[in-house]
Amino acid sequence: MRTIFNAKIGDAAYIQDELSSSLSSSVASKFKEFSKRKRISDSFSDLSEELERIGLRQMRKRIKLEKSFERTPKKKVQTKKHLPPVRKKDSVKRRRIIIASPSDEEHDGKVQTNDDSSENKTEKPKNQSNCSSNASKLSEAAQLLNVSEEKSSISETELERSRQVALNELNKSERFNKTETQLDISVMEVDSSDHDEEEKTEKVGAKNNRSLYEIVDSDDEEEQDQDQSDAAKPAESENHSEIKKSTSFMDQMSGAKGNKSVYEIMDSYETEDPKEAGKNEESDKDKPAENGKSDKDKQAETEMSDEDKPSEIKSPSTIKKSIISTADEEALLAELASSDLSHLEKMFNPLQKSRRQSLHVPSPELAAKNPKLRRRSERVEVGNDFCPSQSFVDMVAEKKRQKNKRKRLSKSLSGAPEDLEEMEIKHERKRLKSSHGASTDSMEEDNENETMTVAEEHHSDGEVSNGEVPIEEKPTTSSEKPSASELPEEGNSAPPALKKDVKRLQAARQAVSHAVNLLAPPKATEAEPRTLSRKLSPQPPVVDKKSAKQKKKGKKKQKPQEASPLKSSDEENHGHRIRTNAGYVTVVDEPPTKVPIIELIKTSSGMVRVEPCTPKQKYFRELPPTPKMHGFREEPGPSGMSRKRAKHAAPKVEHNSAKQAALRFKEQIFARRS
């Protein structure tokens, strides 16, 4: 560059060409290097991002798996290291069962993949030289992740399926969402070739990884149970449920298989159907999901699972126990079905008011044979030798017929059915007294005549009906009682027609009285007619008399308010007192004109008003038209002379003009005579 700048100024074009060529070559080389580095860094960053994404995905899957493992039961397969050491006094050959545990393989694979992912996360590129190694590591990690993903997908689907089975087997009451329907168990569709390959790999894994169980001969069962109970105590704190299941499994195996060799047991287990094995696995998974249930539910489930297992595994003792328990239950159910439990309904009912009764209730057969008798007199009827007379039979039949009749009782009435007719008669008399208290003897006679005519009509109707229907002759002697079914028919065949007619008459009367009350004004009912009007009116009073309380209220008349005496002060009596030159003049109000009370007379046609001009007495005299009759008031005359003397000897009147003028003036002012 220096050489170029030291050249002549005239060679500007040359300098420009040289500069551009040198710059372009250097920039191009640098740009190439930069783009190369950029490409590598971009590829590495892309790889790192991809790795992070895969790692996050894997972490999420791992968390999901852990959660599903918590929900769903883990396979509790007891390996040899968990099994407590069994001490035996006599040296007996122990037979071993080898069971595959594929969960260990999955666990190892997961640990490896997690370690690789954690290592890959921590690694970051620092120089260009590390890029190739990092890329190779990344590709390896991706391959491992893909492999682990393939493995975990199968296990995840299996776990999900088992979880759904467990949730379906839960009762509806124990679910959180009680309205939710049963979960649909999605069935996996797998190609047959892939499935066969997986089965082969599983079998190989099962052969490689097997756990051991010790099974002792059936001769030493008792000693083994004792040793197991002794050995189980320290291990209970760590894995209580696992030890219980393992011991029960060992007991079943020892009871069922007896003194078989190792190979026979292995063969029998290997030859089991794969479906049954899958069922057992599912039941094992379901057990921890239902840990929230009570101990009773657990016991019931264990019994059910024992029943579901094949009959080869069950020992004869357990079979006997189950048969005995079922027989007991059946017997108990049969007893309950046969016994009468009606008393239990009333026993704990708080609304049922009764005496304290013992729980022992006699059977219905005994109660039907020996009925409890209320009175000693009724015990006579129990004997079969009792032969009643015809009159007694008729009397019983009549009583039953009377009882079967419909009786209309008011709420206030209460009495035995025998006294009903007497009570009704008394009630009717009281009502008649209250309504017809003011009526005279003639009215009562009319009433009696009406009722008699009604009765005669009814009697004549009865005679006609009896004449039409032939009378049945009663049997003279009959030792047997009439059947209960015949008695109510007799009661229904002869209804009381007289009562119906009387009721119709009463209803008609009530309707007429109601119409009259509507026609007459309400004030008319207040004033009662006098003795004369009663004598004039031959009809009984239609309107029912008021009750005693209303009468008392009516008697209490309002007292007339007495006017206070006039005071002399002008302030108070300024409206009634006028001051004049002659003196004070008091203005007195006219007395209120008496309104004539209109009286009423009850006639056959109805209520009649009495006008004021109608005479009130039998005999009367006509009064002369005097000024007093027209409202004038008399005042006493001048004192000193009697009227007789004034008539016979008139006094001499002195004509004084001045005096007369003064009197005239006085009259004009005061309008009064002295």
Curated annotation (Swiss-Prot):
The keyword Phosphoprotein applies. Residues 73-97, 400-410, 548-558 have a biased composition (Basic residues). Residues 65-137, 168-321, 352-382, 395-585, 618-659 are annotated as: Disordered. It comes from Drosophila melanogaster. The modification Phosphoserine is found at S248, S358, S391, S414. Residues 233-245, 272-312 have a biased composition (Basic and acidic residues). It comes from the Eukaryota. Transmembrane segments: none annotated. This is Slender lobes-like protein.
